Every structure is written in C-alpha cells, then in structure tokens.
C-alpha cells in the first residue's frame, strides 16, 4: 500500500518533493567564525603600520612558540602577512573528524590573498565554543596587478578566497532529532493551501491523525521513537510529492537595475493608461560683444541660452477585466515603453487600485 501511494504521488501535474518545499525543525546548519593570519603572500599583505592589530596578532603567535619580539620593534613592516576572518557553515549531524569548506576574507588592507596559507585558526560558534579547526592553502579566484606608472587592473575579488575541506570538525552540535514522539515540518514558504495538502497526503498514506497542521507554515507529524525507524520514516516522507498552492500575485521591481518580475497570477482591473515623455533641453551659446575702435568700450561675453521642450505623445491603451500577464506585456511593448516607463505604469496602476497584486520595490 505504501509503495502504491508513493507511485501515485509521483504523477502529480506540478508535484514537488516534500524535501524541496519544507525542512525538519531543528535540523539545520550552524555558522562558525574565527580570526587568524594568512602568511606566504608575495608582498601583498597588510601594511602593518596602518593595521597594528596584524602585528599584534603576529607577535602573540610568536610568543606561543617561545619567541619574544625585542622592545621598540613595533614599526616592523610585514609585507607577506594578512589578518583575516574565517567563516564556515557546520552542517547538521556533522561529526568530529569530518571536513567542511571555509571562506577566508581580509580584514586589513591586504591587496591580495593569492598564494597565501592560513595558519591554524579555531572556529567558534555563537556560544563561544570551538567546533572546528581551520588551516590550509587558499584558492583565490581574483588577481590584482599594478604598474610603475600607477596603472592598475583588478579581476574579481583577490582579497577573499576559499579552502575546500579546510576545517576539521572537533565537536558536534547536539540535536533534538531523536527526542519526542513527533517531528515538525516547516514550510520554506508559508501557505495554508500547501500545508493542508501535505497533511492530507501524509494522512492518506499513513492513516488519519498522523499529520496535523499547526499553522500555515508548520506541520506536526507523529514519528517512531527508535532512531533507525525514524530515519526510514523520514526517507519516505521527504520523497513524498505534493502539489504546492499557488503563490500570492506579486510584482517585483528593482529600481537600481531596472529589473521587473511579474508573477504568474498578476491581473489588472479595467483601466486606461497613457504615458508620455517630456524632454527639456537647455543649451548655452554665449556670444562675444566687441566694441568699435576708439570707443573706449570693453570686450564682454554676453550669455545666450536656449530652452527647448519636447513631449513625445504616447497612445492610450486599455486593460479589460481580468487582464493577464501576457496581455500586460504585449500592450506595454506595443507602445515601446522602456523599463523605467513600465515601472511608472505599474506604480500608477497600483495607486489606482487596478493592479491586483503586491507591488514590491527592492
């Protein structure tokens, strides 16, 4: 019966796997951060006279090896050392000995971390405990080059890099995965329709009352107490395919780049729109006034300005009841509206109450 239910769920028109639209409460990654030194740079490290914390960190490291820096050497210039921040994501269920990728970023005035080596750096969580140790050679995608005449070229970002598998996990994060007789599924996008369909799908497959919707974004599911059975149980649930509810109609506008995204369910109530362009041009054409001979006059520059205003007439187009996305785009393209004009039209439609969607400007 269980196999038949899974096979029937796979033939949904727009079905998505449960693992793609929801996550298990408490099963998540944790952010780690650390502070360390990158050495071995080819003269592109921090200018330690301007970043004293780099030199202080370097001296502290030497003292751990029993090396004492003589007094009065605070102005030493180290060109191959850079102070960096190290960040990583500790995956859920990560165990000691496993490797995780890390990102290394300069926090001083280093020009490039290319060719550098990160020295042993502890990575801490928000609770202050050390969960991983990082060290290794950096992989930097960008580079920086400068000529003697001051000409300079920079490709990508040379002041940051990554170390694949550069951190070793030293401590695992406690998880409540095996606690209690139930699990909570959190939807990536809250939707009452999607939550109801998930509950119905699970209950149809496993029996009434197994799944209960807490709200539009969370679902409580009864789970076995045995850890092994719980893993098998979730492997079935996460591959269950559900038809998610349609998203709320939205129009997203990026005012900086001119990008406009119109959702599938966006419609317009009856409205008539016209959009014209007014261009004002001001030109300066000064003339020189030259007095006649023996007139005791002085040469003067007389300003002369010309102001010209041109307005490009645009035809009016009409939206009927329930106009769809395709009709909106077709009508706007017919009048040759630029992205900036389309933004103004959509904002005006929203103010008029004709745009049946959320207008979001980012």
Swiss-Prot record:
Residues 1-15 form the signal peptide. The keyword Cytoplasm does not apply. Its main location: periplasm. One of its GO terms (biological process) is bacterial-type flagellum-dependent cell motility. Pfam families: FlgI. Keywords: Bacterial flagellum, Periplasm, Signal. GO terms for molecular function: structural molecule activity. It is found in: Periplasm; Bacterial flagellum basal body. GO terms for cellular component: bacterial-type flagellum basal body, distal rod, P ring; outer membrane-bounded periplasmic space. The keyword Manganese does not apply. InterPro entries: Flag_FlgI (IPR001782). The basal body constitutes a major portion of the flagellar organelle and consists of four rings (L,P,S, and M) mounted on a central rod. Assembles around the rod to form the L-ring and probably protects the motor/basal body from shearing forces during rotation. Belongs to the FlgI family. This is Flagellar P-ring protein. It comes from Pseudomonas fluorescens (strain Pf0-1).
């Amino acid at each position: 019966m269980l196999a038949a239910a899974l096979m029937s769920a796979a033939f949904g028109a727009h079905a998505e796997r449960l693992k793609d639209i929801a996550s298990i409460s408490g099963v998540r990654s944790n952010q780690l951060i650390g502070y360390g030194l990158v050495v071995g740079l080819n003269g592109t490290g921090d200018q330690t006279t301007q970043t004293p914390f780099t030199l202080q960190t370097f001296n502290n490291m030497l003292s751990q090896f029993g090396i004492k820096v003589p007094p009065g050497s605070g102005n030493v210039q180290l060109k191959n050392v850079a102070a960096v921040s190290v960040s990583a994501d500790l995956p859920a269920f990560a165990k000691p000995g496993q490797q995780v990728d890390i990102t290394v970023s300069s926090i001083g005035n280093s020009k490039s971390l290319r060719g550098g080596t990160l020295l042993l750096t502890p990575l801490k969580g928000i609770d202050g405990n050390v969960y991983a140790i990082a060290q290794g050679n950096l992989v930097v995608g960008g580079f920086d080059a400068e000529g003697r005449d001051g000409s300079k070229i920079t490709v990508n970002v040379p002041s940051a890099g990554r170390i694949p598998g550069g951190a070793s996990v030293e401590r695992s994060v406690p998880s409540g995965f095996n606690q209690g007789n139930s699990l909570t599924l959190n939807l990536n996008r809250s939707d009452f329709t999607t939550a109801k369909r998930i509950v119905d799908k699970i209950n149809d497959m496993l029996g009434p009352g197994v799944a209960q919707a807490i709200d539009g974004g969370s679902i409580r599911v009864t789970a076995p107490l045995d850890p092994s059975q719980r893993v098998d149980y979730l492997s079935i649930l996460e591959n269950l395919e559900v038809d998610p509810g349609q998203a709320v109609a939205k129009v997203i506008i990026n005012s900086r780049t001119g990008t406009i995204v119109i959702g599938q369910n966006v419609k317009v109530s009856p409205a008539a729109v016209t959009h014209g362009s007014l261009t004002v041009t001001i030109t300066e054409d000064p003339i020189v006034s030259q007095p006649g001979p023996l007139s005791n006059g002085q040469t003067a520059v007389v300003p002369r300005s010309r102001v010209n205003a041109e307005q490009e007439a645009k035809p009016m187009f009409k939206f009927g009841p329930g106009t769809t996305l395709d009709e909106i785009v077709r009508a706007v393209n017919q009048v040759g509206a630029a992205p900036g004009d389309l933004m103004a039209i959509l904002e005006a439609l929203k103010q008029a109450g004709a745009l049946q969607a959320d207008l979001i400007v980012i």
